[in-house]
Amino acid sequence: MTIELKPGGLLIAIEGIDGAGKTTLARRLAATLDAAGARVVLSKEPTNGPWGTQLRQSAATGRLSAEEEAELLIRDRHEHVDTLIAPALARGDIVILDRYFPSMVAYQGAAGLPLDELLERNAFAPRPDVLLLLDLPPPTGLARIRARGDAPNHFETQDNLERCRTIFAALELPGKHVVDASADADSVLRQAHAIIVAALADRLSGDAAHTDTGKAALELLSAGRPA
C-alpha cells in the first residue's frame, strides 16, 4: 500500500546545532516511513547545487560575510523549493529536510543579522508541518563532531553554537517540537516517529481518516514505529 497525502503532502524539517544528529535522524526516519509505505523525499540544505556548494566551501574557509552567506542561502532555497520541495508536496509525498530556513535564522542571526528580517526573507518558503528541533548542549555537539573525525569549522565554536541554540529555542513556528538530542539515536528516532504519526493523524483527520484507506494508512505507519 502506497500512502499519499493529497493535497499538500507533509513537510518535515529537522533542525538543531551542529553535532545534534540531524543527518542520522533524517536518514533513519526516511527509511522507517518508506518501509511503512509512505512516499518519502529526503533532502538537505544547503543543497548540492551551485549556491549550496559555494556555501559549504565558505563554511570550511570562513571567507564570506554573514550577508553574503544569507544571499547564497536564499538563492539556494528558492531553487530547492521550486525544483524539489513544492513538486513533491504537490504529489502528496512526505518531504524530510536535513536543515531548512530556521538554520539560516539561527546561524546568520548569531552572526548579527536581524532575526525579523531573516524570517521575512524566507516568507516564500513553505512552512514545515513538523519542525523537529534536536536540542543539545554545544559541548556535547562539539565532542560528537571531533569523535567522527571532523575538524570544527568557523561556525562550530562553543560561543557561536550557544547563540544558535538560544535562537532556535526562541523561534516560534507552528509544528515545532523539541526533542532531547542528548539521548541515544534509537531514542531520538522513537520520539521523532511518535511526533510524525501524531501529525499524520491530524493531517488525515482533515480528509481521509474516516475512510478505509486513511485508517489503513495510519495503522500501517503506527505499526512501523521503531522498537
From Swiss-Prot:
CDD domains: TMPK. Its EC number is 2.7.4.9. Gene3D superfamilies: P-loop containing nucleotide triphosphate hydrolases. One of its GO terms (cellular component) is cytosol. One of its GO terms (biological process) is dUDP biosynthetic process. The keyword Kinase applies. Keywords: ATP-binding, Kinase, Nucleotide biosynthesis, Nucleotide-binding, Transferase. ATP binds at G16, I17, D18, G19, A20, G21, K22, T23. Pfam families: Thymidylate_kin. It catalyses: dTMP + ATP = dTDP + ADP. It is an enzyme of class 2 (transferase). InterPro entries: P-loop_NTPase, Thymidylate_kin-like_dom, Thymidylate_kinase. GO terms for molecular function: ATP binding; dTMP kinase activity. Belongs to the thymidylate kinase family. PANTHER family: THYMIDYLATE KINASE (PTHR10344), UMP-CMP KINASE 2, MITOCHONDRIAL (PTHR10344:SF4). Phosphorylation of dTMP to form dTDP in both de novo and salvage pathways of dTTP synthesis. NCBIfam families: DTMP_kinase. This is Thymidylate kinase. The lineage of its organism: Bacteria, Pseudomonadati, Pseudomonadota, Gammaproteobacteria, Lysobacterales. The gene is tmk.
